[in-house]
A protein has these predicted regions:
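Beta1/beta-strand and adjacent pyrophosphate-binding region of the FAD-binding site
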Residues: 2-15
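Conserved Rossmann-like nucleotide-cofactor binding loop
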Residues: 15, 38, 165
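Glycine-rich FAD pyrophosphate-binding loop
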Residues: 24-44
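Conserved N-terminal glycine-rich FAD pyrophosphate-binding loop of Rossmann-like flavoproteins
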Residues: 37-57
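A conserved beta-strand/loop capping segment in the N-terminal third of enzymes
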Residues: 53, 57-109
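Predominantly flavin-linked oxidoreductase catalytic cores and closely associated redox partners
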Residues: 114-261
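FAD/FMN-dependent oxidoreductases across multiple families
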Residues: 233, 238-322, 326
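C-terminal helical "tail/cap" subdomain of flavin- and related membrane-associated enzymes
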Residues: 320-412
Length: 412
């Protein structure tokens, strides 16, 4: 038996839960499919820029976020070798102009609960096995792994919001075939008792990678970073008895004095998490009839910490486009042509609002992890620390996509 929905959303991270909430509120029947049980830790820098606070309010989770998140992030630092350079972070408009950090085990749980409260049907933990059909008549086969139970969902429209690490079934072979020595693998760990100032957001620069630190909820420090596959392979060979995450931590302590100082008396909570390889780049128009948001649409190098921002804002941009047109987008007679037109417009909007963030992040990432450009840039940043402030502004940390802002205003 097939359970029918207007829309199926794949992935219940910030992008997926946000679009599910917005569509459900607009009268759509929505299936929200997520393969992992919540709460769960996730590889992520966990920063939420202030430009997204109004979006969290509109989704109904703003007060809970404000109560739990870490301190306002007012300063940015660049750490390389033994040196640290500090500059102010730019302020966004509004009553709360600076970003804050909240662990994904809390943020994602808040957002998926909001989607369910709005009327979305939560399929969790169910994993997507296959998608067939086309606009107006998609069929999704899902499986509950712990019981081996399977179900079939019908949906007129599909939104992919599965992030970086879990490609759609149709993408898996291509991902495996595309691996190179330049691939980036991501790591994250949490620490208690760290001495990093709560208002400071350090960016880490070292050969073959980059990273960051932030103090999130309950004073817990998040340390996250990326490392090229060839550097990771050499690191593992040099430390054959260590797990990859432990070897990565040793590298950071050795190559960034700021990390060693911050973690000097800290204790790690839980194991290191690892994911990858990352796939920075644009995938918003894959040509398969599926709408894409969040990292499924396009992934920025995480050096600028814009992943959650792009996830939330891209969900609002898509919702503003499709939510009012449920009848035309879901009717079998019109779905194919209307969805094609909507996808063209969505691709145009997405590139206009987010492509620059990807380009800026790529430029910063390649400077940070390549020794020669990093060495050349360092004297300039040391002399003019305001470059760091400008860099945060260039990556759109203080701006919200206009379509998202207008939708928030409509809810208000």
């Amino acid at each position: 038996m097939t359970t029918m929905f207007d829309a199926a959303v794949i992935g219940a991270g910030p992008a997926g839960s946000a679009i599910a909430t917005l569509l459900a509120r607009a009268g759509w029947s929505v299936a929200l499919v997520e393969q992992q049980a919540f709460p769960r830790r996730k590889v992520c820098g966990e920063c939420v820029a202030a430009s997204n606070f109004a979006l969290l309010d509109a989704l109904g989770v703003g007060p809970e976020f404000a109560e739990r998140a870490g301190a306002e992030l007012r300063r940015v630092a660049l750490m390389r070798g033994d040196e640290t350079i500090v500059a102010p972070l730019p302020a966004a408009a509004g009553a709360h102009p600076f970003g804050r950090a909240l662990g994904r085990e809390y943020l994602d749980t808040l957002l998926v609960a909001a989607a369910e409260a709005a009327g979305a049907t939560r399929w969790q933990p169910w994993s997507l096995q296959a998608i067939s059909g086309s606009a107006g008549r998609f069929v999704l086969r899902v499986r509950r792994d712990e019981t081996a139970e399977e179900a079939e969902l019908g949906a007129a429209l599909v939104v992919a919001a599965h992030g970086s690490w879990q490609p759609l079934p149709s993408e898996r072979d291509e991902r495996r075939d595309a691996r190179t020595v330049g691939d980036l693998f991501a790591f994250k760990a949490n620490f208690r008792g760290a001495t990093l100032a709560g208002d400071l957001l350090p960016v880490l620069s070292f050969p073959g990678g980059y990273g960051g630190m932030v103090v999130a909820d309950d004073g817990v420090l998040t340390l996250a970073g990326c490392l090229r596959a060839d550097r990771l392979r050499a690191l593992r060979a040099a430390h054959p008895g260590l797990r990859a995450g432990d070897a990565f931590e040793a590298l950071l302590r050795n190559e960034c004095r700021g990390v060693a100082d911050a973690l000097d008396v800290a204790t790690r909570e839980g194991a290191w998490l690892a994911s990858g390889p990352l796939r920075p780049g644009v995938r918003v128009d894959a040509g398969d009839g599926v709408f894409r948001i969040g990292n499924a649409a396009g992934e920025a190098h995480p050096i600028v910490g814009e992943g959650i921002s792009m996830a939330l804002q891209s969900a609002f941009v898509l919702a503003a486009l499709i939510a009012p047109a449920r009848a035309e987008l879901t009717a079998p007679a019109s779905a194919a042509s209307v969805q094609r037109s909507a996808q063209r417009e969505h691709t145009r909007l997405w590139r206009r609002r987010f492509a620059r963030r990807l380009a800026v992040a790529a430029a910063f990432a390649h400077v940070a992890m390549r020794p020669a450009p990093a060495a050349a840039a360092w004297p300039l940043v040391r002399r003019w620390p305001g470059i760091l402030t400008a860099g945060a502004r260039w990556s759109d940390k203080t701006r919200c996509a206009p379509e998202a802002a207008r939708l928030v205003a409509a809810f208000a």
